[in-house]
Amino acid sequence: MPKKKPTPIQLNPAPDGSAVNGTSSAETNLEALQKKLEELELDEQQRKRLEAFLTQKQKVGELKDDDFEKISELGAGNGGVVFKVSHKPSGLVMARKLIHLEIKPAIRNQIIRELQVLHECNSPYIVGFYGAFYSDGEISICMEHMDGGSLDQVLKKAGRIPEQILGKVSIAVIKGLTYLREKHKIMHRDVKPSNILVNSRGEIKLCDFGVSGQLIDSMANSFVGTRSYMSPERLQGTHYSVQSDIWSMGLSLVEMAVGRYPIPPPDAKELELMFGCQVEGDAAETPPRPRTPGRPLSSYGMDSRPPMAIFELLDYIVNEPPPKLPSGVFSLEFQDFVNKCLIKNPAERADLKQLMVHAFIKRSDAEEVDFAGWLCSTIGLNQPSTPTHAAGV
């Protein structure tokens, strides 16, 4: 079906003509923003939602520590803690990430400056940004609050995430990565379930991407947990590109489909426990990994093998065959899609354009899936009065 010409985006200047977070000439900025948004292929619903977000954002003005009231903690990770907060002057609920850094003022100012690029990241597949500021030894990054949380939290409640749902997730992640690359020349650098956020309107958005080189450098020591999603070429310290993000997406999809981090791969016994039936395929043929001498036997999900030490895990990613989905429980298209994401040589790995036209994505795009309904029933959220079908996907 041919795409109809998008209606122009309507953004109303803030009543007092005040600038967004300290930028001048609000009206000129709005015109430039309208032009950028019209270049995106948005459907009517996505257009209206982006308009509403940007119109609300204009009322926010400059962000200050005193203007926030803590509601609850949403999670911790990547060197920071995220709180659900109320921005008292505007009445908006936001997510506020606090990153404690012992750094010189010049570095701090550079980080805040680099984070300003986020004001220009406006897409249905990217978490909205209200602003960043520094106070009391902490950098604050204020974002749109996504009431469904992150997919790692959803996975804990769901046990496993169904293939149809993961189809919609895959589309959103590919479109989000494509937007960052094409419009901003940015790589994500940290794709994993905890950086894919969802909400009760059925939206699926990426957060925590590497927009500030200085922030990445300043937080280098806190990235240990993330290494388990890094591509082999990145772990080996060689040149890496957006192809590295595709590996991370593939690994995340296998994790969400089977219900646990997929390295080492589950053996036949564990797969039978997971899926309640005998499962065919290579994943079921993995020989049990010998237990490290002197290490106690501990439970690892349904797997009786002990968890790997980080160095064993990274060695496995670089030197062993990549994970794959067990056959017999997932469609051939989904299995092939994941296999193309998890090719160890980045030059042979599928790129974003190839993935966008893959049979699994085409099928998922055509499927009517009530993502919002599934999410709300899975995590016990109230659904908005106008349910949506995998909004914007």
UniProtKB/Swiss-Prot annotation:
It is a peripheral membrane protein. One of its GO terms (biological process) is heart development. Changing residue 97 to R: Loss of catalytic activity. No effect on BRAF-KSR1 or BRAF-KSR2 dimerization. Residues 270-307 are annotated as: RAF1-binding. It catalyses: L-seryl-[protein] + ATP = O-phospho-L-seryl-[protein] + ADP + H(+); L-threonyl-[protein] + ATP = O-phospho-L-threonyl-[protein] + ADP + H(+); L-tyrosyl-[protein] + ATP = O-phospho-L-tyrosyl-[protein] + ADP + H(+). Residues 1-27 are annotated as: Disordered. Its EC number is 2.7.12.2. Residues 68-361 form the Protein kinase domain. Gene3D superfamilies: Phosphorylase Kinase, domain 1 (3.30.200.20), Transferase(Phosphotransferase) domain 1 (1.10.510.10). CDD domains: PKc_MEK1. K-252a binds at residues 144-146, 194. The proline-rich region localized between residues 270 and 307 is important for binding to RAF1 and activation of MAP2K1/MEK1. It is linked to Cardiofaciocutaneous syndrome 3: A form of cardiofaciocutaneous syndrome, a multiple congenital anomaly disorder characterized by a distinctive facial appearance, heart defects and intellectual disability. Heart defects include pulmonic stenosis, atrial septal defects and hypertrophic cardiomyopathy. Some affected individuals present with ectodermal abnormalities such as sparse, friable hair, hyperkeratotic skin lesions and a generalized ichthyosis-like condition. Typical facial features are similar to Noonan syndrome. Melorheostosis, isolated: A sclerosing bone disorder characterized by hyperostosis of the cortex of tubular bones, frequently involving one limb. The lesions may be accompanied by abnormalities of adjacent soft tissue, joint contractures, sclerodermatous skin lesions, muscle atrophy, or hemangioma. This is Dual specificity mitogen-activated protein kinase kinase 1.
